[in-house]
């Protein structure tokens, strides 16, 4: 989206192809999914206008080193289109799913006013290249929705971390990819007052806003265990995108007024783990380690299939004390559930190999020494958190280009970003390279900066 905006403002007329619906229709469809369990594989928490970030906490902080001002530019653009100006100066900027939805819509309108096009329910289903394998190949056209051929010499591949069918198509067409380490785990819910008291020394947060945390631990087997996408005053949501598979995520509104804090507690996994690792859904027998680009995706899918079965289509949940004992919970304790989507009690120990469960528990106990009560027995766990980052990387050179010329892998799905701000920064960087190479179709629009 940011790549398209930058190109449009510089006089280019980009065509944005979005497999899902516009943000308004998408929001309605996601709400129906949470209520009924009826999943649309093309328009859901992962796919549709704004991508996965639209249904998240809307965190805007990033660890990416930025010497070119792109981070500041992302925040400035967000305020230009409706974001609170405070995100320009607060330590941990946050925008919220409700505000981000409006901003995304406004950016799309701006792109269209400048001559760009945004086509919804338009999934790229194939890539047409010219040149023989092993020689200088380049993109020639895209196939949309299985039939429409769209000629293209320059394609920005910003597909997100969950476009598994697109990854499969890219691999089948000989576009290089490689497996990448990521992390998997469970969402944990605590009362927000517990986190406030630990961080502020008092249960009520006042003008400080609900407290957050960022925790890391090293397990006895040297695996990293850490909190991820912590959502103060938020909800755990069903974030599935494939039938028969289930994944969760965290989400907060702008006011972060929910009763609970939640975060993913995740354990690192590497390409060496993907092949032959036992999960509740069995072992992958078709893995071609160590360079099998799809191994991580198959690993994710096995975990998500197990989660779907454990919850019978609902989010499988368990109290932490029961997780340690390997028994199904019979009810809640002092933590009230805060979910979007149906949930059911299950034994989440059946999700993971024992090595990952052990590392998870070591991390939880360690975090209990940092935040008193973090490892309380009635903390609510939900699974599975499997979409923490892309399981693949699509190689690109210093000019942001794939070995297949004309394809520019970009953002989180390509393995070069991890969150809203870093993905937007990568989009801007990609646009800068395209602008450097090609002349615009119309005069550029200058935007006053503040």
What spans do the regions from the language model cover?
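Residues forming the flavin
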Residues: 1-450
């Amino acid at each position: 989206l940011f790549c398209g905006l930058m190109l449009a403002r510089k006089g280019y007329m980009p065509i944005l192809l979005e497999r899902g619906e516009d943000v308004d229709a998408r929001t309605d469809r996601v709400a129906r999914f949470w209520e009924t369990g009826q999943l649309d594989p093309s328009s859901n928490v992962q796919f549709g206008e704004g991508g996965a970030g639209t249904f998240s906490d809307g965190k805007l902080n990033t660890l990416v080193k930025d010497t070119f001002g792109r981070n500041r530019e992302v925040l400035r653009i967000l305020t230009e289109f409706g974001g609170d100006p405070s995100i320009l100066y607060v330590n941990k900027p946050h925008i919220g799913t409700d505000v981000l939805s409006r901003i995304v819509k406004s950016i799309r309108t701006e792109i269209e006013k400048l001559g760009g096009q945004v086509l919804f329910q338009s999934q790229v289903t194939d890539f047409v290249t010219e040149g023989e394998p092993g020689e200088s190949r380049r993109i020639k056209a895209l196939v949309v929705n299985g039939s429409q051929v769209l000629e293209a010499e320059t394609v920005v591949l910003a597909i997100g971390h969950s476009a598994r069918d697109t990854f499969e198509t890219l691999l089948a067409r000989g576009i290089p990819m490689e497996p990448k380490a990521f992390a998997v785990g469970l969402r944990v819910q605590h009362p927000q007052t517990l986190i406030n008291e630990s961080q502020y020394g008092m249960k009520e947060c006042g003008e400080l806003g609900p407290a957050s945390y960022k925790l890391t631990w090293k397990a006895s087997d040297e695996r990293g265990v850490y909190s991820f996408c912590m959502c103060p005053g938020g909800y755990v949501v069903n974030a599935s995108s494939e039938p028969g598979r289930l994944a969760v995520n965290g989400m907060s509104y702008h006011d972060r007024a929910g009763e609970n804090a939640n975060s993913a507690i995740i354990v690192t996994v590497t390409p060496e783990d993907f092949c032959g690792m036992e999960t509740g859904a069995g072992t992958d027998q078709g893995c071609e380690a160590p360079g099998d680009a799809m191994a991580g995706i198959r690993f994710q899918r096995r975990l998500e299939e197990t989660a779907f079965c454990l919850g019978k289509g609902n989010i499988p949940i368990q109290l932490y004390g029961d997780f340690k004992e390997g028994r199904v919970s019979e009810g809640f304790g002092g933590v009230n559930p805060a979910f979007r989507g149906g949930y059911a009690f299950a034994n989440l120990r059946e999700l993971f190999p024992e090595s990952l469960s052990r590392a998870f528990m070591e991390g939880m106990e360690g975090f209990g020494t940092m935040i008193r009560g973090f490892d309380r027995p009635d903390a609510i766990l939900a699974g599975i958190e499997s979409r923490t980052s892309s399981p693949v990387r699509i190689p690109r050179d210093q000019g942001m280009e794939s070995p297949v010329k004309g394809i520019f892998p970009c953002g989180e799905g390509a393995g070069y970003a991890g969150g809203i701000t870093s993905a937007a920064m990568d989009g801007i960087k990609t646009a800068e390279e395209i602008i450097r190479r090609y002349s615009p179709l119309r005069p550029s629009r200058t935007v006053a900066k503040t």
